[in-house]
Amino acid sequence: MTPPLSDKQTLPPKQTIVVKLGTSVLTGGTLKLDRAHMVELVRQCAYLRRYGHKVIIVTSGAIAAGREHLDYPELPKTMASKQLLAAVGQSRLIQEWESLFGIYGLHVGQMLLTRADLDDRERYLNARDMLIALLDNGIIPVVNENDAVATTEIKVGDNDNLSALVGILGGADKLLLLTDQPGLFTADPRNNPDAELIREVHTIDETLRKLAGGSAGGLGTGGMATKLQAADVARRAGIEVIIAAGSRPDVISDLASGESVGTRFLPLDTPLESRKRWILAGPPPAGDIVIDAGAAKAVLERGSSLLSKGISEVKGAFERGEVARIFDTNGVLLARGICRYSSRDMAMIVGKHSQEIYKVLGYEYGPVAIHRDDLVVI
């Protein structure tokens, strides 16, 4: 029996905390919602609210709730079947959260998002304003991807990455990724008894990504690899991220108190400004740009804009104002940014000096291909 929350250490100054609850946490590995465990999770969130912290819930479980409500129907494994279950289950899921938080006199507000809500800068800002309005009025936002209408093209993809984007929208201090694993290990603990828990991560590199693998649970869409992606995005925005076991007693309150639980990802000392956060978290890249060694050095070490002279190759089709990824000639991802020229135009000015752009195209949108204010180093 764990001690009551009131006996625990004092919580740090008021924070905004995103709690991401995966399907495996909400179902306990079964085919239906584990309501007893949801009660416990809500108790901890209510404790945080009592002490002035703002809490955002990013919840999975709509499809599981829909399947349970319809008495586990046999459906074809299609997008339409998933959307059917999500449409039925989302209303059941929000009712569960509303009922449980109501025990503590707390109100919830539902936000259903798609990729399209984040791609467009104006819609992104509207979503941010709505989220902040809920928080400022003492309402707990309960966020999920709108699976009932989301197609492959407009899906965020998983609630791990969605929670990172929501954390950026809400100006969060912490993102708690609760899963069925205690954290990130040096090997898969399910088949390697020598695997050790990684307590703290300062840099996310290829070695760490390989450790994360790519497996996912049967009911959910996110594995450890997607959690690592989410952590990388969030920490660049100045958000501390912790991956921990959702079944651990008092896990939410302990993490909020700063206890050493799970795997902690330290945020960058100098987080990205608002516009660059949107570039990192918002629109998916529409194409790729390969740059030479000189341009790579200028972008990475001097924070320079990307000039057409340094471009070696343009891949994919994108329009002016869309986001592209930037690679070096070895295929290493360096950055992403908003393009001043379309892929057609860029292909024509590859390797050209800035003063040659007008001569080649017959018009110009400035001397740079991507301005440094629109460029985010990865």
UniProtKB/Swiss-Prot annotation:
GO terms for molecular function: ATP binding; glutamate 5-kinase activity; RNA binding. The keyword Cytoplasm applies. It catalyses: L-glutamate + ATP = L-glutamyl 5-phosphate + ADP. ATP binds at K20, T179, D180, T221, G222, G223, M224, A225, T226, K227. The keyword Kinase applies. Catalyzes the transfer of a phosphate group to glutamate to form L-glutamate 5-phosphate. This is Glutamate 5-kinase. It comes from Photobacterium profundum (strain SS9).
